[in-house]
Amino acid sequence: MLFSGGQYSPVGRPEEVLLIYKIFLVIICFHAILVTSLKENAGNSSLLSPSAESSLVSLVPYSNGTPDAASEVLSTLNRTEKSKITILKTFNASGVKSQRNICNLSSICSDSVFFRGEIVFQHDDHYNVTQNQDIVNSTFAGVLSLSELKRTELNKTLQTLSETYFIVCATAEAQNTLNCTFTVKLNETMNVCAMMVTFKSVQIRPMEQCCCSPRTPCPSSPEELEKLQCDLQDPIVCLADQPHGPPVSSSSKPVPVVPQATIFSHVASDFSLAEPLDHALMTSSTPSLAQETRLPSPQPTISLTSSPAIDLPVQHVVASSSLPQTDLSHTLSPVQSSIPSPTTAAPSVPEKVVAISTPPGETVVNTSSVPDLEAQVSQMEKALSLGSLEPNLAGEMVNRVSKLLHSPLALLAPLAQRLLKVVDAIGLQLNFSSTTISLTSPSLALAVIRVNASNFNTTTFAAQDPANLQVSLEAQAPKNSIGAITLPSSLMSNLPASEVELASRVQFNFFETPALFQDPSLENLSLISYVISSSVTNMTIKNLTRNVTVALKHINPSQDDLTVKCVFWDLNRNGGRGGWSSDGCSVKEKRMNETICTCSHLTSFGILLDLSRTSLPPSQMMALTFITYIGCGLSSIFLSVTLVTYIAFEKIRRDYPSKILIQLCAALLLLNLVFLLDSWIALYNARGFCISVAVFLHYFLLVSFTWMGLEAFHMYLALVKVFNTYIRKYILKFCIVGWGIPAVVVSIVLTISPDNYGIGSYGKFPNGTPDDFCWINSSVVFYITVVGYFCVIFLLNVSMFIVVLVQLCRIKKKKQLGAQRKTSIQDLRSIAGLTFLLGITWGFAFFAWGPVNLTFMYLFAIFNTLQGFFIFIFYCAAKENVRKQWRRYLCCGKLRLAENSDWSKTATNGLKKQTVNQGVSSSSNSLQSSCNSTNSTTLLVNSDCSVHASGNGNASTERNGVSFSVQNGDVCLHDLTGKQHMFSDKEDSCNGKSRMALRRTSKRGSLHFIEQM
């Protein structure tokens, strides 16, 4: 255009030529500006577009004004290398929108300052930072490159000296350099020159003026910092002769002083203990982070500190050598509290000094050193050693500890355990006259409550409003609480008698900042919540019968898509320095801004009568759990079949033994069903539901014991009190006793205290999760209402069982040897049936002690969970009359019995006729319900004699009569469980000519002798 304009300009008219020339100049300038703008936009677009070769994306690369730091880094790279870099966002701090106000970053971030640093690593540089030899032995797929080594050292240094930091690094392989730009957040007491001493070619600039307002919150993430568009000031210059002194700014304009106001530690505590979501695609940028973290599993105690944790997938990540080389990495990490390694220059700096120029030109110097912190801690320890503390002095100590929590983490780490002991000692030595007392400070809250170990109620400690910390001690946590811990009523139920008097107070602590809980072994994990703890008179309590529930709010509620983990503080980890452990902890519920920590729930049937109430090894607990649930499931199925059979077929339920058996089967079925539901209900940790389930489980257990005892009592009436025994409304009275007495016992326990029931823990599984169960929490209630109750029933049942065995031995002495052999198997089957019917197998619980504990626990679990199955086998499937009813109504074809089949007819070799006066045999030798209840339900008889007693004739015209039929001395042992007793006047064959039957009628007491020739 310039050429064409010059071509057609009129000659001899200088004014017009000059005007056209000016117009051309304006157009040229406009085009130049336009071309420059397009180039910049194209450059930004290329940076914002993802690269196919990049295997790792930097979430927050920062850029500043002119000259841009990222541009300087990128300018050193060639075209191919630039294509490997993927930048999602740029941080433009040069342009400030006119419609927004400019404020100082220090005015909204109290006690914290931000710096921007730039450093270039050369291949032949020798830094005063020694290389960590663990890098060579790390789990990276290949040998670490120069960029990875230098980036690791930079990461470790920033991790030690700063609160939060962000790194952007780019490798220029052509120039053999590594260019890194980082942003750090430091406590105002930290001297930034200590960082400059570590690396010799670093340039650090303060970040002060930003687009913000006084109401703008302090940035806690790279995105928030980017939105503020902070401008960079002139680089800081440290004096050569005073490398650890105050930094001197090269700018003539003063730097505003950081006001001493509210603490910014909420942000520092906002990061969780967590692992990256995808371990396969990410490795650590530091040697210690390259390996997967494995947590030990110490036994948890009540002296615990809990916090949920959350995965941060962008932490400490670089590309593995097996993937395409990534030239850009991003690190977001809180400081890990640990003693500074010799690989950094931090330990050589005994005192951190920061000098900040005030607007008038004055200098304010804040100092913080290890000797100073140790002196303060020692002073408090000395005061605590003198004895009890008055509330005023204790409050001053709490405030002092609160201030110390905001000291540089590198200086605070060696004193962390001592400070935790100081906090516990304050609560232990605190002298107060009321029931409860609470002391609060900006970053620490402490509450102590006097308790009675023998009558401890459920207590919840909750903290509210982190800006103005308040605490409460109630039965339930308030809705607006930011952290709460609930101690169950069974907390001290297992304490030895010598420690009951010592457990006089419970202490709760709430830490607004996790400064004392830095775990160097979890470098890729960080906290997302506050920290809450509890202890009982500074003692350790193990084997809690009910879990402790911890609910903690997330400081940053936007992290909902990340995986959380519940952890507690183990004082014995890391060589006594303490560390986070997830042993036995799991997440019950996770919401947008809250995590509730609890544990998984399974249990063994042996818990119901675990007299020792001690925990089993995890592997054995798992095996017992499988046996328990399989056995309970099978028993429930076969008990249901037994109930349906006896209820559906009227002919087999007319006698008393059958009716008692129906009641026992119903009780056992309900017991098994409630037991199977118990662990599932316990998962929800709902107090009301758990108490209800525990009450029903207790009730049906006692009902089952009672009906077993009534079976034995019925046998006593039939075998011992044979004559002159008449009970009106026999079954009705049995039902009142069988279902009523357990209800009275459970009602008394509930009236005393509903907290006698609840969630209890009875051991651990191999994965570390505790075995929790809704059951009786009080040991006194357990031993009286379960163990004592069962002992009475068990003694009665064993006595009756012995009577049966004695009767069997007496009769067998009269039998011939050949006849004894033929009945041995039947007798054994009868004994086995009585063993399960009377609950003799429950006696295994009395032997589950000492070295044989495990063996009898297995026997207990196997036989008692299968009790319903064995009852079905011996009292349903093995009974001839029951099988005939099945064949008659359930089978078809040849297996089905004819309608006119006399199912109850007894076939004998010597007896061809039946008389109406013949005695009637019943299944359990029981009392007859009426004169018409004549159907036989005999289980086992001698095959050489009568298969079944006749059920076709009337035994007596009186109600509740007892009939006994004797044939040649053959005793049906099962019949001895009820109302039948067989004897003979002489030993003869089954077809003998003379038989005698003894019949008693309850009203007349007369004897009828029927002799058949």
Swiss-Prot record:
Epididymis-specific expression (at protein level). Associated with apical membranes of efferent ductule and proximal epididymal duct epithelia. Disulfide bonds join C566-C597, C585-C599, C690-C774. The keyword Disulfide bond applies. Residues 566-615 are annotated as: GPS. Residues 645-663, 710-733, 807-830, 875-1013 are cytoplasmic. GO terms for cellular component: apical plasma membrane; plasma membrane. It comes from the Eukaryota. SMART domains: GPS (SM00303). Keywords: Cell membrane, Disulfide bond, G-protein coupled receptor, Glycoprotein, Membrane, Phosphoprotein, Receptor, Signal, Transducer, Transmembrane, Transmembrane helix. Residues 457-615 form the GAIN-B domain. Glycans are attached at residues 44, 78, 92, 104, 128, 137, 155, 179, 187, 366, 431, 452, 457, 524, 538, 543, 547, 593, 777, 853. The record marks L602, T603 as: Cleavage. It is found in: Apical cell membrane. The modification Phosphoserine is found at S1006. Heterodimer of 2 chains generated by proteolytic processing; the large extracellular N-terminal fragment and the membrane-bound C-terminal fragment predominantly remain associated and non-covalently linked. Interacts with CFTR. Belongs to the G-protein coupled receptor 2 family. Adhesion G-protein coupled receptor (ADGR) subfamily. This is Adhesion G-protein coupled receptor G2. The lineage of its organism: Eukaryota, Metazoa, Chordata, Craniata, Vertebrata. The gene is Adgrg2.
